[in-house]
Amino acid sequence: IVYQPWTYLQTEWLEAKGENLNAAIAAHPELEFYAYYIEKDTDIDFTTGQKIDASESMLSMLNLPDSHKGIYEINSFEEFNERFYNTDHHWNYIGSYEAYRDVLSVLGGGEPLEPTGVYHSGLRFSGAKSKQFSRFFSDEMTIYSFASTPRWEYM
């Protein structure tokens, strides 16, 4: 992983994102909004441990109470390596479960489902990051299993 310093263009992009989200919040006062920032390998220089603070910058722009904001923090390469796929920018089963518990807490939800086991599918896939390496690398698709899952309704 090669760290790239934060640029002015990225700051402009972040500010535009914040303005768009605030416009949506203002346009729909009948809805409750929540924001959850996911730190990833582009948010921290793993050599020095220095963060770009995009998470704090982004969330501080939003017209939301602090109780409606959350951050999935990555503080070291070890944490990143444990929680994200090697070949992709998405969480693996460990990271997605940690985020699920965290988001549930931010939303004021109930008790989280607890995994009953780990399922190793044996299936391999090459994520978006592997394109940079001519697809020489792959990850195994591994997920938690649960006894039951609740039914959800979405708008």
Where are these regions (language model features)?
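Extracellular glycan-modifying ectodomains
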Residues: 1-155
